[in-house]
C-alpha cells in the first residue's frame, strides 16, 4: 500500500467486498495516468469488460496489453475482455462515432468514467471550433454521457441496480474559477462566453472547465436518479503528468509539489473507484473530495450555477461544421432528448441536441 500524501487525508483501501464481476466499464483517457490506474483497479474488482477510450488507438492498444499482463489483473481477473476504442475529446464528431460504436457493439454498460482531460495554457480552438480545454474537459464528455445514457438506463433495469456516470473533477473549481468575478452576461451563452478569447485566463481556465463539469453533473443527476447515479470527484493533488503543458516556470514548482505532497496514482485512482463503485445514491449530483461529499459545490452562489438554472434551451445553440455544412445544435434539455431516454433510439443521427440545461 502506498504511503499517504503529506497534507492530504489518506484514502482508505477499497472495501474488500466491493465487486463488479460481470460488469462493463468505460474509462476515457484510459491509456495513462489516473485513467489507466482506475482501469486496473476496476479490473481487479472483477469487471468483465473494460473499454479504454483513447485519442491514439495505438497507445490504447498498448495500454490494453499492459493491463492484460499486469500481475494483479492476471491473478484476479485473467479472462477479462479489454478493448481500446478511439475517442478524440477535441472533436464532437469523434465523440459521436465513439458513442455509435459503443451502442452498436456493447449490450450492457454499468460504469462510464469521464476521466480524460488536459491543461491548456494558451488559447486554442478545438476541431469542433470551441476553446480547446472546455471542449476536451467538458463538452464532448457531456455528449457521450447523453449518447450512452439510454444504454446505462437499460443496463440498470436489467440488473436492478443503478448504473454510474462519474466525472473526474477538481477542487480548483471552488477557489480558482473566474466566474465569481466575471459572470456570464445575460446576453451571452455558455459556449459564447468561453469561446471568447477575451475571457480566457490561462491560469484559471482549467478551474473554469471543472466548474462547468460540476454544473453538468447536477443537471444530469436529475434525469433518472434511481437508475443512473451521476457524480463528480476530485482525486486531489496526484503525481501524474497533467502539468506537461505548463510553462517551465510553473512546471518545475508543480512537479516538486506533486512529488513531495501529491498522492500516488494508485491512491488518487481509489477516489474515483470509490465514487464509481462504492458510494451510493447519496452522492447523486454531488462533488466529492477525499471520499466525502463537499457541500460547497452544491451551494455556490456565484453566477454560473444560477445562470444554468434560469437559461432557456435556445441560449446554448451553436453552429458546427464537419464535412458537410450541417447545422448541429447544442440545446438544453430538449424534449426530444428526454423522449429518447424513455423510448430508445438516438436523437443525434443527423443533428445532435446536447441536453445542457444552460
UniProtKB/Swiss-Prot annotation:
Pathway: Secondary metabolite biosynthesis
Pfam families membership: adh_short (PF00106)
Active-site residue list: 206, 210
Alphabetized SUPFAM superfamilies for the sequence: NAD(P)-binding Rossmann-fold domains
Enzyme class: oxidoreductase
Keywords: NADP, Oxidoreductase
EC number(s) reported in the record: 1.1.1.-
Family: Belongs to the short-chain dehydrogenases/reductases (SDR) family.
Protein name per Swiss-Prot or TrEMBL: Short chain dehydrogenase sor7
Taxonomic source organism: Hypocrea jecorina (strain QM6a) (Trichoderma reesei)
